[in-house]
A protein has these predicted regions:
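Conserved N-terminal phosphate-binding loop of PLP-dependent enzymes in the Aspartate aminotransferase
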Residues: 1-155
Length: 155
């Protein structure tokens, strides 16, 4: 909820198809589906979001992330030598599953990564990469290479 404001304030955005919107819509606001909270319409959060979106556009963040994502995918091919499956990604989020029955894999992987200066998110047997958009190729190399070494140690 903070990403759209550049991390300054909580703000969320809801997107939906028109047919779903119409199912909840009513001209009478007392009968329509109302969803709001204390952050609704916060002008400072909205201003931060607009500034963040302007930076995304002027600095071509999406295009740069597409290139970074392709680089990450190519780099992750080194993991093919490990017992992994279901290598996948959506944008800058990359994930794969480790073939292991070790019940402490997630905890062991997290601790080993942290000791190497790497913050990764294993959930069960699934390892996720969700790098910041500012990541560079040297950092991507470290992220993937260190993860490969860590997995070898903990499985």
């Amino acid at each position: 909820s903070k990403g759209i404001t550049g991390g300054y304030l909580p703000l969320s955005v809801v997107l939906t198809r028109d047919e779903i919107y119409q199912a909840f819509y009513d001209d009478n606001v007392t009968k329509g589906f109302l969803h709001s909270h204390s952050y609704t319409g916060n002008p400072l959060a909205c201003s931060a979001a607009l500034a963040t979106l302007a930076i995304f556009e002027s600095d071509h963040i999406i295009e740069k992330n597409q290139d970074k994502s392709v680089y990450i995918q190519a780099k992750m091919q080194v993991l093919a030598n490990l017992p992994i499956q279901h290598l996948r990604h959506q944008g800058m989020i990359h994930a794969f599953d480790i073939k292991t029955n070790k019940p402490t894999f997630s905890r062991d992987c997290y601790a080993a990564a942290l000791s190497e200066g790497l913050l990764i998110r294993p959930i069960g047997n699934t390892v996720y990469f969700m790098p910041p958009y500012t990541i560079n190729e040297t950092e991507i190399d470290f992220m993937v290479d260190a993860t490969m070494d860590i997995i070898k140690k903990v499985i």
